[in-house]
């Protein structure tokens, strides 16, 4: 039996496995027999665009996790971290949750390990900051912010109280901006229910760029800036972190901010596995052809955040690592892997940017679907409708819909469950990023 192994269960790997399984079912009567296996450290596909909503207490973490077991019909899901690939022997070696090393053979290999948070050589960053690429990180940020607000309420040291009530978010792209406004809304609910002035909670949003969310253009970026300022978020552009300590940060302009909470949301880079493969890369991502095949390896395909997919609409460029591209590349992957097995024709990946949607908290958003610039309530409606359309499972869509309705009419819950510890949410623990060894 022909064996197809998909590495990674993010948007691209999930969609590839789903499309390929559907195609094989359609060809089953003609004798098609393909064994599809997806290997991932987790048993779900994570809908990452809603992680700011998880951190802000709008959506439950379960609602953004799409289970592989009952969603990918005809696909065997295997828990494990892929460590290496033998391209000559056609085997993948991985470590399972009990630290047992196992291997599986393949006739076609699909490399979609995704991405991890891009870190820089900032002293203390890996130890004291947290990212937003996993449920562990989102849950930790939510619980940590609430815990700090609760501790500030009874702290007798004014300086430490102010530090507990100061949240620093680094990265004014759409993810970082969404996180800042959702945490701001969570803090406002906490202030209302815990009887303190919401103005006592300070939010600082940092970015080296000259504009907030340059992806949405100057007009919508300016609209977003007005919303951020109206909600009391201190936006500082052209500056970032120089040092991170347990109770303060130092910025590149040498100013100091006392804080106990630092969120690092500055972009992504290809998964660590990419460096181990010995294949050509571009900007830290695997080089692939327009049909998503790895050059020189006709049985190997790659796409998503881990691949430098040529953008045929902008010759010389590669597609950005967005959920929109990842999902659509997964569909083309499924088609092309099937074609390589003799079922159908190959297709090059070509997709024009359909625009972005950015949720800016209660009653506001900005969006540019099909280059139509929207802000305010119309953008909010488009943003939420898009997410409900894009979530690939009816049960999850229904749950998120109910969460949105609840958020419209009721205050957010300000309960800290402690489900994700500080160690769980470290970049190494939650994303698998190798950390620098201590001197």
Which ranges hold each PLM region?
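Rossmann-like NAD(P)H-binding beta-loop-alpha module
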Residues: 143-199
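FAD-binding core/adjacent interface of flavoenzyme oxidoreductases
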Residues: 5, 76-168, 263
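Short glycine-rich anion-binding loops that position phosphate/pyrophosphate groups of nucleotides
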Residues: 12, 114-117, 180, 268-270
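C-terminal, flexible cofactor-proximal segment of oxidoreductases
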Residues: 325, 332-439
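A Rossmann-like FAD-binding core segment of flavoenzymes
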Residues: 33-35, 75-92, 104, 184-290, ...
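FAD-site-proximal beta/loop scaffold in flavoenzymes
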Residues: 127-158, 247-250, 256-328
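Beta1-alpha1 glycine-rich phosphate/pyrophosphate-binding loop at the start
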Residues: 1-84, 174-216, 263
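Active-site substrate-recognition segment that forms the wall
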Residues: 38, 166-168, 173-186, 230, ...
